[in-house]
């Protein structure tokens, strides 16, 4: 599966659906973005069950601002609608591979329990 270019209007639907979605915030003038692009594209071919999306921050400034993107590339990973990873900077291929496997291996019951626990703690503050 090839990468998908997202617009601001498509972002929420893409990241809230079941499964795993990676979002690469990038720009054409960004050297590290251009270095990471083939790594991201290769992963999209290797893992067709995962959605790999890209957002051009120059074109989609509204969503870049809403997502508080201050440095590019910034990579986000969502699983079942929950942001589980966010980091600025281009990952080397081996690290990106490790990240993909880590997101796949997440126990989402534990993630949901931790979110509920944090929510309860915030309500009790």
Features from the language model and the residues they span:
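The canonical Cys-X-X-Cys-His
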Residues: 30-33, 75
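Structural cue for short, hydrophobic secondary-structure segments
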Residues: 24-26, 77
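Short acidic DE-rich linear segments
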Residues: 117-125
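Conserved Rossmann-like nucleotide-binding pocket used by diverse enzymes
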Residues: 2, 26, 51-53
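Short pre-active-site segment immediately N-terminal to redox-active cysteine/selenocysteine motifs
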Residues: 19, 26-29, 71
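A short beta-strand-turn-helix
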Residues: 3-21, 61
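Conserved helix-turn-beta segment immediately C-terminal to the redox Cys motif
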Residues: 18-22, 35-55, 61
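Non-catalytic, surface beta->alpha helical segment in thiol-disulfide oxidoreductase systems
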Residues: 71, 77-110
């Amino acid at each position: 599966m090839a990468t998908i270019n997202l617009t601001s209007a498509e972002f929420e639907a893409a990241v809230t659906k079941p499964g795993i979605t990676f979002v690469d915030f990038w720009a054409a003038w960004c050297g590290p973005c251009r270095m990471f692009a083939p790594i991201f594209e290769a992963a999209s071919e290797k893992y067709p069950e995962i959605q790999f999306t890209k957002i051009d921050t120059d074109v989609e400034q509204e969503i870049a601002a809403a997502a508080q993107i201050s440095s590019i590339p910034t990579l986000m990973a969502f699983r079942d609608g929950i942001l589980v990873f966010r980091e600025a900077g281009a990952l080397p291929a081996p690290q990106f591979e490790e990240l993909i496997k880590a997101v796949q291996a997440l126990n989402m019951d534990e993630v949901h329990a931790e979110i509920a626990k944090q929510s309860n703690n915030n309500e009790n503050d």
